[in-house]
Amino acid sequence: MKRISLFILALVLIVSGMNAQQVVWQPDVIIKLTPEWKGERYPDGRPKVPDELLERLKNCAFEEVQGYLGMHGYRNVFENFASLYENGWHIIHPERVMTGRALTAQFMPMRPDFNDYVQAQAKEEGTHTPVTNYAPIIKLQEGDIYVADSYGKMEGGTLIGSNLGNAIANASKRGVIYNGSLRDYEGLEAIGENFNGWIRGYDPSGIQQMMTAWVNAPIRIGRITILPGDAILAKKNLGTSAKDAPL
């Protein structure tokens, strides 16, 4: 009986402590998360890496970027997924190089009680629409790359199709990096120069039994921990996340 009482008490403490967990991380938290950045920021708190730096980053080899960041203590900045999955990345337009600023999202398997909390907490934070796979897209700015961890889910894990892909292209003029899948591949491929994607694969199914856990928070993509606002360099079969590097 004593063990059961302690277990129930632990659950009560966990649930009561959930009020502190943000859904959309707020600007003051992101600023505290990225204190090394001394330059301009977006209103949401993310570092706004200059466009000039992002253009220069396109011409950098991964060895240069990884070497420089490694000297400054940042060693987990490179991922090609080949170490985890046989097929590595699938790239919609492999001939293109993509750089941009990370806007992050974490997806999880649907759990109704947690999703209820997410919806209620987001409303308290000022979000006026349901928190779905569209929630990160409406926050995109030009130059952003939408980076999401959807835990590698393929069937039923398709975060976007061509409609949302067009919305991303119009807003960010960049594209996506997903540890997961998408649908309507041919429609996404036809969007044009303002969209590209690094994904695990694609599937004709619609998104099912998934929930958005948080937006603009730290996420993991393979071997990389990505923070909101990180500068991203994505090339053929490869991806890297860079800090404030004077390249």
Regions found by a protein language model. Name each.
Residues 21-71:
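N-terminal pre-domain segments of enzymes
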Residues 45, 168, 230-232:
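Buried hydrophobic positions in well-ordered alpha/beta secondary-structure cores of metabolic enzymes
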Residues 5-16:
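Bacterial N-terminal signal peptides
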Residues 62-64, 76-228, 241-247:
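Feature captures the catalytic cores and cofactor-binding loops of soluble hydro-lyases/lyases
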Residues 231-232, 237-240:
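Channel- or pocket-lining gating/hinge segments that regulate access to a cavity or pore
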